[in-house]
């Protein structure tokens, strides 16, 4: 991985948006090709929907595994990608992507992390876990007191 100089974007071969099972498996596939990756996810830990919403749920559609728990799947993927040493950017949301004339991408996260990326893989699944707010005028005045949102 190329370390960025202060204020300069991180030069990355690939930025993967989403650290759920698909994003983790993408690290593995890229690693087999000798391509390093940066993973960006809004959650504070890898695993996406599997670990955030249903870690104990049995999964039946993984090739060569008749049944596998959601957390077990994530643990196996984490072990599988360990040799490829991805760079993690957890608790960050991609807020800006722009394709440049030279074919590379400028990517910026909610934490201000900036990338100069050769490619972007969108493995965001259902997207970031953010509540769908009530669309009524004035409802925001009651948020946190009488209107509460939670995703989990």
Enumerate the language-model features and the residues they cover.
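Beta1-alpha1 glycine-rich phosphate/pyrophosphate-binding loop at the start
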Residues: 6-87
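FAD-binding core/adjacent interface of flavoenzyme oxidoreductases
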Residues: 1-17, 32-33, 88-152
């Amino acid at each position: 991985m190329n370390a960025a100089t202060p204020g300069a974007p991180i030069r990355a071969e690939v930025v993967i948006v989403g650290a759920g099972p698909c994003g983790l498996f993408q690290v593995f596939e890229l690693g087999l090709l000798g391509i390093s990756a940066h993973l960006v996810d809004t959650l504070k830990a890898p695993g996406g929907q599997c670990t955030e919403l249903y870690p104990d749920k049995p999964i039946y559609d993984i090739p060569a595994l008749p049944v596998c728990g959601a957390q077990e799947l994530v643990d196996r993927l984490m072990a599988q990608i360990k040799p490829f040493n991805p760079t993690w950017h957890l608790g960050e949301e991609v807020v800006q992507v722009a394709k440049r004339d030279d074919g590379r991408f400028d990517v910026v996260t909610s934490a201000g992390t900036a990338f100069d990326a050769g490619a972007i893989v969108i493995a965001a699944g259902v997207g970031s876990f953010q509540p769908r707010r009530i669309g009524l005028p004035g409802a925001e005045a009651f948020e946190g007191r009488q209107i509460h949102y939670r995703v989990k």
